[in-house]
Amino acid sequence: MAQAQSGICAEANLHGLHLFFNVFDGQDESLRAKLKQVSAIEEEFSDQFSESMLSCMVAIGAQYWPHILPEYIPSELQSFPNINHSDHQMSVQPCDLFVQIRSDREDVNHLFALQILKLFAPDVELVEQIRNFRFLDGRDFNGFIYGGDTAHGRKKRATALISNPGNFEDQG
């Protein structure tokens, strides 16, 4: 049965770190092997710092997906759109990989990020890193207040999963 990454369905944390990467040419196979190690590193950190409630998520950009897993491209996969609204503007900065790290301890996020950077080197370029936090009125890591239509529990997990004929870790 398919399982969501821990960061997909985790509850809000106090601290977070977003890492945006671009992959250097010719590093696809090397990076593919390294991506399989992220969950083991997360498990190790979760055991060592259990009180931190660490979670992690790795997202592969729509433009990079065919390089890393060409045999299975989800039908729903698309690039993040530009969002222009009178109150908000979110412009797109395409990247190959996005790593979201969240926990209740900023030091654990920092240490975990160092492990990710060490793991991915020299295959990637860190384009940007953004520290984030839980705001006073309980906003989520993106700065939005959860509305009544936000999925919770099993519905949240069902919404998060894509139909996949196999596990990513089983793919080459």
Segments (PLM) and residue ranges:
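Long, histidine/aromatic-enriched segments associated with O2/redox biology
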Residues: 1-172
